[in-house]
């Protein structure tokens, strides 16, 4: 069975979600959460927290593939730069654990999940809950990571080729 980790990197909050592709094109939500870092800490300390927590998640769930939301350029260059740091840490841990990785634009993820490339957070949360048949997804960072993982499964056609079974 294929397990996919989806990541929504951020310096303050990094969302993660793990799905498993099952028989009959079902997608099972195995776990998800948000890695939070305190803004009072230095950049190095915050990045270390993200790195260590992601490493624990990867070793706990042993995913086969990874999907990461691509960076978007914010109006505030400092925000874009710190987002880039968090993405770099996420990509580094995926590389260190030999996980094949794909990156997806936020609008592409939204369109693949909701049919609308400009869907809002509420629409994404609603749709991922429907797809994985779970009401346990409350945080939008986890929902975004879950949407990224589902988007990867759809894009790679795992669900439609019977590979998950």
Swiss-Prot record:
Annotated EC: 3.1.21.10
CDD domains (alphabetical): RuvC
List of residues binding Mg(2+) 1: 8, 141
Pfam families: RuvC
Named cofactor requirement(s): Mg(2+)
Free-text remark on how the cofactor is bound: Binds 2 Mg(2+) ion per subunit.
SUPFAM superfamilies, per database record: Ribonuclease H-like
Main location: cytoplasm
Alphabetic keyword roster: Cytoplasm, DNA damage, DNA recombination, DNA repair, DNA-binding, Endonuclease, Hydrolase, Magnesium, Metal-binding, Nuclease
GO cellular component terms given for this protein: cytoplasm; Holliday junction resolvase complex
Binding site for Mg(2+) 2: 69
Family: Belongs to the RuvC family.
Its job: The RuvA-RuvB-RuvC complex processes Holliday junction (HJ) DNA during genetic recombination and DNA repair. Endonuclease that resolves HJ intermediates. Cleaves cruciform DNA by making single-stranded nicks across the HJ at symmetrical positions within the homologous arms, yielding a 5'-phosphate and a 3'-hydroxyl group; requires a central core of homology in the junction. The consensus cleavage sequence is 5'-(A/T)TT(C/G)-3'. Cleavage occurs on the 3'-side of the TT dinucleotide at the point of strand exchange.
Quaternary context: Homodimer which binds Holliday junction (HJ) DNA. The HJ becomes 2-fold symmetrical on binding to RuvC with unstacked arms; it has a different conformation from HJ DNA in complex with RuvA. In the full resolvosome a probable DNA-RuvA(4)-RuvB(12)-RuvC(2) complex forms which resolves the HJ.
The protein, known as: Crossover junction endodeoxyribonuclease RuvC
């Amino acid at each position: 069975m294929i397990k996919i980790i989806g990541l929504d990197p951020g310096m303050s909050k990094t969302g993660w979600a793990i799905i498993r592709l099952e028989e009959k094109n079902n997608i099972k939500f195995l776990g998800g959460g948000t890695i939070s870092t305190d803004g009072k800490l230095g950049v190095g300390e915050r990045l270390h927290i993200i790195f260590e927590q992601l490493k624990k998640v990867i070793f706990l769930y042993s995913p086969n593939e990874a999907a990461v939301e691509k960076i978007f350029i914010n109006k505030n260059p400092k925000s874009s730069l710190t987002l880039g740091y968090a993405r770099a840490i996420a990509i580094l841990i995926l590389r260190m654990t030999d996980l094949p990785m794909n990156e997806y634009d936020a609008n592409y993820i939204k369109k693949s999940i909701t049919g609308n490339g400009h869907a809002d957070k509420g629409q994404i949360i609603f749709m991922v809950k429907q797809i994985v048949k779970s009401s346990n997804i409350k945080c939008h960072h986890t929902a975004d990571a879950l949407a990224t993982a589902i988007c990867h499964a759809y894009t790679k056609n795992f669900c439609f080729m019977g590979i998950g079974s």
